[in-house]
Amino acid sequence: MKYIQKTNYQFDLDQLNFEWNNIKEFYLTKDHWYQEVQTCLQHSETCVDKYTEGCGSIKRAGGRTERDFCLINDIYRGTLFETIINELNVVRSRIMISKRHTVYSIHIDRTKRSHLVLNTNPDTFFILSENTIEKSEIMHIPADGYIYMVDTTKPHTFVNAGEESRTHLVMCHG
């Protein structure tokens, strides 16, 4: 079974990285980051902190669902990021950075996720499984501008065993 599917959606990776680097350099401050590795592109109507309340586990959201995080943050208006969010009709979109030599705990998400890799290294990969090694899928998602649909409703983790960090745009399907 394929837990990770390359879609037909492809976007201009150079433009995305140009916009991301400008936003990161000129607009984002330390306060816009959750644990220095996540920042939100969307917020809910009740957010006090529009850039961090949708980060981390959805359990942190105080009863809100992923669908509640549907409003685009101002600094992303008019960007290719907004175009992608609108075209895919996704919610709770975040930039997630996996620092070098890190791994997430195995967990299950409530909804599937779309991933668009902004930058990566060859030693990063998802591991998804049905609790047996025979049914596991291990995959590196390249920085090729394509959207990849990942069934994160199955037990999974992400590993960055490389020397460089990787940056993904992660979007939820509510």
Place the predicted regions along the sequence by residue:
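Non-heme Fe(II)/2-oxoglutarate
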Residues: 1-85
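Intrinsic-disorder/low-complexity, polar/charged segments enriched in Ser/Thr/Lys/Arg/Asp/Glu/Gln
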Residues: 2-4, 111-113, 168
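A short glycine-rich, His/Asp/Glu-containing loop-to-beta-strand
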Residues: 80-100
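Residues that flank catalytic or metal-binding motifs in active/ligand-binding sites
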Residues: 91, 110-112, 165
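Short, conserved beta-strand element in jelly-roll/cupin
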Residues: 97-98, 108-124
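Short beta-strand His + acidic residue motifs that chelate non-heme Fe in jelly-roll/DSBH
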Residues: 104-106, 124-126, 141, 149-163, ...
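A short hydrophobic beta-strand segment most commonly corresponding to one strand
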Residues: 114-120, 147-149, 163-174
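A short beta-strand-loop-beta hairpin characteristic of the jelly-roll/cupin
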Residues: 119-143
